[in-house]
């Protein structure tokens, strides 16, 4: 786990907002037709609509969060879905609690 890279990813307010929103996606993002948001994840277009930024900007932010392991990605047909990687987030919380 690259802590510096994770903290860099979290230093952007919008990326942090996306990660927080994915914790309770029903509350923070519009409903989507395909799949349960807790199982499959949230579609990029729903995240885009909830955040209010362009799809390319949101996709870039999600790619950064994925690169550092904070979100998981799942592709179903032409759609890409994201959800939090709770294992990484729990490990990060444990490291912060013990080492910082």
Residue ranges and their predicted role:
Residues 88-92:
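Short, charged/polar, Gly/Pro-enriched secondary-structure boundary elements
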Residues 67-76, 83:
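Beta-hairpin "wing" of winged helix-turn-helix
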Residues 1-21, 62, 67-70:
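N-terminal leader segment of winged-helix/HTH proteins
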Residues 8, 14-54, 80-87:
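N-terminal helix-turn-helix DNA-binding core of bacterial DNA-binding proteins
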Residues 95-96:
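Residue-level signal for well-ordered alpha-helical positions
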Residues 61, 78:
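Gly/Ser/Thr-rich helix-start
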